[in-house]
Amino acid sequence: MAILVVALKYALHILGFEPVEQSSLHNSVISSVTFVIGFLLSATIADYKESERIPSEFAAQVENMYDDAASIYQNYPTFDIEGFRSQMYKIATGFTKDARRRSYDVRNDIRGLLPYFAEMEKGGVPANFIVKLKQQQVALLRSRHRVNYIQRIKFIPSATILARSIVIVLIALLLVTDINPFYGGLVMIGLISFILIYMLILIRVISTPFHKAGRTQDDVSLFLIKDAVNYLKNQANKTK
């Protein structure tokens, strides 16, 4: 895209269509556009960095919940520990599907733990143990909701429209500006165009941290969730 801008600027220079004289106002316009883009990028990166923390927290909660349930089962073997493990396995695999694709809803899997909590209550498991597991269940649900929100909601959509508009206006202004020396100015126009266009593309990409696996190199990795899935899978034989 930046190469196209440079080529177009060169063509306009050859044709002599550069009616705008270079002035100090150009520096002010470029600074203002850069500020708006930087503000939007910093806000988007904040959500992206939060998204990077969520998989590790979710994986830790999943493994910890199973470990707690297995520990409880040793003293109170009154509930289906294999069923509980299977449900945690569904939650871990379901989170990956939910984050990558909107067609799957892991909330039903998370709520599927409630019957096991009821079995624990009937089996005489101390209330504080069950309360802790329920709190962890809420934490799983909170993580799922946060990921879903970040995936679907764009940060100040009007600001994104503004950023794209002013970048287009700025590039158009630079194209019709008589810049001296020309070739040095041509390089600067190409550099400015490249930076601003790349920043807009970066904002669009990182505003959706969880793409389908392998779609972009900037996706948030879910390898810790896969580790939790493998951990639960390895525990299957131990509960038999």
For each predicted feature, which ranges?
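Alpha-helical transmembrane anchor segments
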Residues: M1-L25, Y149-K240
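Juxtamembrane membrane-water interface segments immediately C-terminal to a transmembrane helix
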Residues: P19, Y48-A60, F79
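Alpha-helical membrane-embedding segments
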Residues: E52-A69, F84-A99, V220-Q235
